Amino acid sequence: ESGMSAEDTAELIAQQRPDIAVAIASGAVPFDWVPIKTALIAEELQKRGIATIANNTLVSVAAFDKWRSNIMFRSFVKAAKGIYIHHELFLAEKKNPGVSVNVYKEYVFYRIKEMNFPVIVKDTLGAGSIGVEVMNSYEEVESFLNSDRNNSDIMVEELIQGEQFGTEIHGVEGRYSVLPPIAFSVTKEGITDPLSSVKFGPE
């Protein structure tokens, strides 16, 4: 977030002649894209022959986009039921006079009706829990989607009830370690606050 390009930052680091560079990314608002920047810096350092420990850009971009993260999670864990809503398609009939019936909108509402409530409605790109709303009924979600408040691509997901835990996986090139559980603190709405988590686990 310094305003320096990845190339200039990598050059500054390279001048220190490190044996290895380890990326440590902190959160940023409103967009938590620091990991993307550190991944770009790592690529530049690797071009200069400096070893790095950092996520690659593909993983960093996938983690930045909440829907891409959701798809990634679904490949190896049971994730909450959810749907991605493409803003332009959802409003297709308003911008295209030739569209008399918006089948995409019909599909979106059909899927939301199948969900268990409450659900969370969130922007696909915001940092942490910024902008996340809890909605308790189908009618509440329908009203939101048909209002002017719906102004970007969003996700609607079932809210998993109960205390929230997570973990971190550290490693490189196939050698990974799963760290002890993390107990997430939550906002008054019951949404995870990843910047205020407490780590603990078995001895």
Language model: regions and residue ranges:
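Glycine-rich phosphate-binding loop signature in dinucleotide/nucleotide-binding domains
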Residues: I13-P18, K113-M115, R149-N150
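Structural motif
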Residues: A21-V22, I120, M155
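Short acidic active-site motifs
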Residues: D8-T9, Y107, E140
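ATP-binding N-terminal substructure of ATP-dependent carboxylate-amine bond-forming enzymes
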Residues: E1-I53, L58, L91-K95
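Alpha-helix N-cap recognition
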Residues: V103-Y104, M135-E140
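ATP-dependent carboxylate/phosphate-activation module, predominantly the ATP-grasp catalytic core
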Residues: E139, E158-E203
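A conserved helix-loop-beta module that forms one wall/lid of the active-site cleft
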Residues: E43-G131
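Conserved residues at the C-terminal ends of beta-strands
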Residues: I24, I85, I182
